[in-house]
Amino acid sequence: EGVPKSLPALLQSRRIQEKAADVGFDWEKNSQVIAKVDEEIAELKDAIKINKGINEEFGDVLFSLVNLSRHLDIDPESSLKKSTIKFISRFKEIEKKVDIEKLSLEELDKIWNENKEKYNLEK
């Protein structure tokens, strides 16, 4: 109630969770929220195994991650944008180095991880 349905899904989810928290329906510790994320991921894995309810369980994972972002005081929208920009940057680096279409996924993954390590060292 009171949360516009026209809001983007991440923001709508966060606002609904904030309203629930305002009346006491909330975890006290980050570890409890992380446990809920783990539980939802396990349910998604089960849904994938039986090829049923995948979309719903995926939504539950996203909802629980938005809740974790709220607990960590992270804006999920800007966090996702930042990760997307980071992915694009790393992918472009790989494209400069190799002909992606000629390598196996395993070879590309190795290069990806090398670039990731390089990026982490530069932080």
Spans of model-derived segments:
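Flexible "arm" and connector segments at domain edges
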Residues: E1-F58, L62-K123
